[in-house]
Amino acid sequence: MTENTSAEGPQTLRELQIANRQLGARNAKLVELLQASRTKLEEINGRLEALAEPPSTYGTLLQANRDFTAEVFTAGRRMRLMVSPHVPQHELVPGAMVRLGEGQQVVEVTGQPDFGDIAQVVEVSGDRLIIADKVGEEYVVKAAGDLAKEVVTGDSVIVDRKSGWAFEAVPRAETNNLILEEVPDVTYDDIGGLGQQITQIRDAVELPFLHPEIYTRYGLRPPKGVLLYGPPGNGKTLIAKAVANSLAQSDSPYFLNIKGPELLNKFVGETERQIRAIFEQARRVASSGRPVIVFFDEMEALFRTRGTGVSSDMESTVVPQLLAELDGVEAAGNVIVIGASNREELIDPAILRPGRLDVKIRIARPDAFGAAAILSKHLDASLPIDADFSAATGSNEAAAAALRQSIVDELFTRDEEHRYVTLHYADGSREDLYWADFVSGAMLANIVDRAKTLAIKDALHNGANGTDGLRPEHVNAAVLAEVGDSEDLPDTTNPAEWARIYGHGTKRVVDIDVHKV
């Protein structure tokens, strides 16, 4: 009996130890499960309590006081509310959106409102802004945070009219599309056939900017504005861009490129607002000493002669706004306005008088010499030229010159084959116009592009072992295609208007005969 007990004792002890360890592991697992259940239960209880809470209201913080109260605009009225001690004092910034808990106390700061009405800044006065809505009504609001330091006149801001706060500056896409602030990459060397006109505008624009001290010595005031006018497609916009680029070589100019038709807006006063914003921006930049060029393309679309409107007659308000801004340009010093138009007779005379757009430069159609100069910018020896043609002419340079001359000869020949239209005047006389009378820089560039396309198609068709490069037949075909595509453009329903646009309206035109190519 003793032997059995002593034999079984150690074995029983080991079993008890194993069982004890197993029970301990189970107990630890039960404790872990119990803790997880308790956490889950607390989470569920928290959700139930949150569901039982009344809905929160929000308001705009007007002012935080030292006695843990705050002035809050909520539900359309101003209220003084208690601030929860859990809310950090440094977050209580006027203009911030706050959440109100049960009992109408501030329990959380949720940041700045990111929605509201859009208004235009008219004036910045300390931490207050004078703003105007889309119908022109002005009112005063407070600027939240550092907004007053960030905005300038003409900027758009998000406002809450009821609380009287402006929260954030908003970029206006339509205004940004009208303004190209970067300096264009067009130089005078890129413009051919307009040497005299380039000299005129350089004398009018660049000299006063580059040598102001000499103008002061002579008591000569620089011109406020320049009008570039003439038939379409002859380089008016290119010249304005080249002016800005030239000034950039000695200074850092600001180029505002305004597309006239895009400023038009159906809302009363909106076009005038944008004009004010543009010139305010120009004056602000000019005050730092930088030259500013405000370029109005298609000027006749905006500033037509007053009294010629058919319905709204918006010219009666838009033109005076521009006149007021032009009269204010002199005070700015470094601002000059350049306008471009192919219908200069439609622009209000008050804009064109001396003292506003002082210098008027006609950009006429190129003659044969000017056309060759323009073509030299688009067709030179750097282009692929047919090897046989290059060998026949002696060099790539000679071949390119021959191709250019071929285009000029084809366009500027005045014979029956090259007659374009016949104008019939009211006095019974008539006048024949030829291809040469309708040549423009844009047309010449398009002819070269057509010739390149034909050469590319031939190269693809002939393969690697075929001929490659520009040939005379390419440029000749391009000329015929360009003229042929234009033969349906003359407006026979209103011949006088069409002739005037294209610079041939010396007398009253009553009819047009178009001669097919």
Swiss-Prot record:
Annotated GO biological process: modification-dependent protein catabolic process; proteasomal protein catabolic process
Pfam families documented for this protein: AAA, Prot_ATP_ID_OB_C, Prot_ATP_ID_OB_N
Family matches, as HAMAP family: ARC_ATPase
Binding site residues for ATP: G233, N234, G235, K236, T237, L238
Subunit structure: Homohexamer. Assembles into a hexameric ring structure.
SUPFAM superfamilies reported for this sequence: P-loop containing nucleoside triphosphate hydrolases
Disulfide bridge positions per record: none
The UniProt record lists the keyword Transferase: no
A GO molecular function held by the record: ATP binding
GO CC annotations, alphabetized: proteasome complex
Family: Belongs to the AAA ATPase family.
Swiss-Prot/TrEMBL keywords: ATP-binding, Coiled coil, Nucleotide-binding
Coiled coil ranges: 25-53
Name under which the protein is recorded: AAA ATPase forming ring-shaped complexes
